[in-house]
């Protein structure tokens, strides 16, 4: 069966509805069980096996094609040079708003991609580890701008991406704790020449005005082999964000060591109002100014409905 995309000539994307995209699964086997999937769920987002089958399996198949093609190209380069070079990971960037489901998407893709024989070693990195510490943000008056571009140690992130793309071994990634809402000083995760790196972050597709030829500026997206944007209506994401805060309020915030433990002294109505205020004053502003304007730089867009299901897929024409 040939799948015909919904084609709009004024857009650089091929558009597929859920059924059309699901047909691209072909004979790709479903290797995840319900038990496997339970370990990948988000705080409020529940991904079903049906969602994996219809959306994520076709996506993993496409990405596997891309990764294998890049590996073949690298082998051709090594053959031309007459000597092996360090393995260069394939880097996938996943962007989108707070609470839109980037982390869940990253975990599901890691689980699926690692089951393909040509690229079993997949690592997920989050840009949260490159946020400045709370102490530094407070000193610079940026605590209310946490998550905005200026709150990240971009030079460190770019150095790490350069090291990974250069094939360096044992690259250290700073650890961020959502429980403490801060960088965990002295703790690192190690990335050691994986086949694929998935980088998840808010502003990773953002660019700026490049400097002069003498001072060329490098952007995070320059290191991507493939980029993906998780999208939904802002009003829908606002509800997801409030639901997520309330879910944490009922669970992890009860720990006295949690940064947001003080919220447990409030009523559910007060916490919901607090979350809505944070959304309107911080997260929505960041979405509109620094995230959404760069959506069309992604090679693939996953468009979600209010129930978290992906209803449309946009694939950039090659």
Swiss-Prot record:
GO terms for molecular function: ATP binding; pantothenate kinase activity. The gene is coaA. Pathway: Cofactor biosynthesis; coenzyme A biosynthesis; CoA from (R)-pantothenate: step 1/5. SUPFAM superfamilies: P-loop containing nucleoside triphosphate hydrolases. Belongs to the prokaryotic pantothenate kinase family. One of its GO terms (biological process) is coenzyme A biosynthetic process. PANTHER family: URIDINE KINASE. Keywords: ATP-binding, Coenzyme A biosynthesis, Cytoplasm, Kinase, Nucleotide-binding, Transferase. GO terms for cellular component: cytoplasm. CDD domains: PanK. It is an enzyme of class 2 (transferase). It catalyses: (R)-pantothenate + ATP = (R)-4'-phosphopantothenate + ADP + H(+). NCBIfam families: panK_bact. InterPro entries: P-loop_NTPase, PanK, PRK/URK. ATP binds at residues 96-103. This is Pantothenate kinase.
